[in-house]
Structures are given as C-alpha cells and as structure tokens.
Curated annotation (Swiss-Prot):
This is Lipoprotein-releasing system ATP-binding protein LolD. Residues 6-220 form the ABC transporter domain. Its main location: membrane. It is found in: Cell inner membrane.
C-alpha cells in the first residue's frame, strides 16, 4: 500500500471584501498517496487554484491543516524546494537562460551536482520532444515548447508531489498526451503524486482519481 504524503484536513478559505465575507472553500478534505494521479475539475472561479496554493504551502487556509507526514523539513520554503514541484499555465521561464539552464536551476539552488543535473534535465527534455532545443533561449521557443520546459523544470528535483495548474492549457493534443505519459511514468517509477487542475475532461478521466470542486466542497466526480 502506498504511503500517504499529503493531507488537507477541514480546509476553509474565506476572504473579506468590504463588509462581505467571500467563502471560497469550506471544510474541504483530501488525502493524497504516493504515486497517485489526481485531477481536479470545476468551473472558473470555483477555488481550484486557491486549493492548489494552499496544498503547495503558498497560501494559508482560514481554518484547517495542511499535513505532510514524514517530511524531514519543517520550514515551508524548504518543503517547497525539496518536496514539491509546481507547474502553472504561464511558464515563468528566465528569458536570459537557455531551456537547459532553466530546467537545472532548481537543482543548482538545492546545491546538488551540476553534472548529474544536466544529465537528468537533458533526459527529461528529450522525453518531452525538446532534445534539439536544449540551448535555445525562451524567445526562440513556441508557447507550447516553453510550457514543456516549465514542466521539465518541475520534475528536475524529483519532487514527492507535483501541483499543476492547467499544465496543458497551451498545448496541442499530441503534446498533451506526451505530457500525460511523462506524468504517468514519473508517478509509477518515482512514486511522485501529481495533483492537476484542468479543464481538459479527456485528460482528467485518464487520472487515477477525479474530483470536482463545487459549492466550495471537493467530491469524487
């Protein structure tokens, strides 16, 4: 049985808007195990991105707990660096660095071996069809290619959990399928859990579990 690596317990998120309280999430629960592929769907504005930000320790819940069992890190920035990987719809690549340099950056920040980082990054980029674009600058890449570089960057530190917000939103169907196959490989071979917010229902139904966020609650779809 796979170990539990993330627990969202009774999570609520409320905002003050003048004298009005805006309730985004209410008493939401989610348990994530090693190697699980989880998709979260829901209408725009339903709180999906807020949920990912809380799970990724980028935002604090109004109530509830984010529990990462057995993590050797206590400080949030260290957990984010060593334990979590993030993919956003916007790639956020560093424009003055090559595709390869963008991918290895998190590994170098972690103080790990550069040679090994280059080897791993080259393999990931090749798996994503970018083996001939290693030394291209972001400005020389298409939108889909930039997003694939960002996906490769999220994988370089071999995180326990990847949090992906519309990771294939700018990709064509063929590349979307390649990304899913890479996610599947990472989940099965490295026991990495992937939590993905998506509007792509075909992709969502390929995942191990599918949840729908509606009326501030998360339910099996």
């Amino acid at each position: 049985m796979n170990n539990t690596i993330l627990i969202l317990k009774n999570i609520s998120k409320h905002y003050s808007q003048g004298k009005t309280i805006v309730r985004v999430l209410d008493d939401l629960n989610l348990t994530v195990n090693e190697g699980e592929l989880i998709a979260i769907i829901g209408s725009s504005g339903s709180g999906k991105s807020t949920l990912l930000h809380i799970a990724g320790l980028l935002d604090k819940p109004t109530k509830g707990q984010v529990i990462i069992p057995n993590s050797k890190y206590q400080k949030y920035h260290l957990i984010r660096l060593h334990y979590l990987g993030f993919i956003y719809q916007q790639h956020h690549l560093l424009k003055d660095f090559t595709a390869l340099e963008n991918v290895i950056m998190p590994r170098l920040i972690s103080g790990l071996d550069q040679k090994e980082a280059i080897e791993d990054a080259t393999k990931i980029l090749d798996d994503l069809g970018l083996g001939k674009k290693l030394y291209n600058m972001p400005g020389e890449l298409s939108g889909g290619e930039k997003q694939r570089v960002a996906i490769a960057r999220s994988l370089i530190n071999k995180p326990k959990i990847i949090l992906a917000d519309e990771p294939t939103g700018n990709l064509d169907p063929k590349t979307t399928n390649e990304v899913f196959n890479l996610f599947l490989k990472v989940a099965r071979e490295q026991n990495t859990a992937i939590i993905m917010v998506t509007h792509n229902y075909e992709l969502a139904h390929k995942m191990d579990k599918l949840y729908k966020l509606k009326h501030r609650l998360l339910n099996i779809a």
